[in-house]
Every structure is written in structure tokens, then in C-alpha cells.
Amino acid sequence: MGKFSKQISEANRAFIAKQHMYFVATAPLSKEGRVNLSPKGLDSFKVISDTQVGYMDLVSSGNETSAHTLENGRITIMFCSYDDKPQILRLYGKGLSLIHI
């Protein structure tokens, strides 16, 4: 059974730091819209505090992640490892798009 926490623990931070890839999921409020799940990587993710994280997203045409986040803020970020001890860590929260022009 999964464990839930309102804060990112030191063990979570260590796990996140070891991952080379993570996934970001967002969805619109509309029933007609679709859930968007995007793989992310490189060195684009940062734990800011026990309750805040950030990542840099490279915007492309049809960027649903940014559109959904601007619409409703709902976001899930998932890290997973397939080592000797497989593990999944999901961060559920409210996202904020900061657009730099």
C-alpha cells in the first residue's frame, strides 16, 4: 500500500536525485480534453523546499502541460526506479507556469 506525506523527506530527496528521468502529468477540466503525460529529464528538476519543487519545461507547439497548468494548476510528477528495489514516488500538487518571453 502506498504511503502519503505532506512533505518531501530526506529519503525522497535522495531518491529524486538519483533519477535520470521523471514524468509530468496534467489534465484539463473539460471532459473532452485528454490527460497529458510527458517524460522529462536532463537536469531540469529541483527540490526547493519540503513542500515545493520546480522544473524547467521546454515549450513546444501544442504544449498541453503549460495550457493545463494555466487553466487549473493540477499536476502530478512521478519518479520511478527499476533497480534491485523498484520504487515509485508521486508528487501531487498545484503547478504554476512562469512563461519567459
Which residue ranges define each predicted feature?
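A short mixed-secondary-structure module that forms the rim of ligand-binding clefts
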Residues: 39-96
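Conserved small/polar residues in nucleotide/adenosyl-binding loops
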Residues: 99-101
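N-terminal structural module
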Residues: 1-56
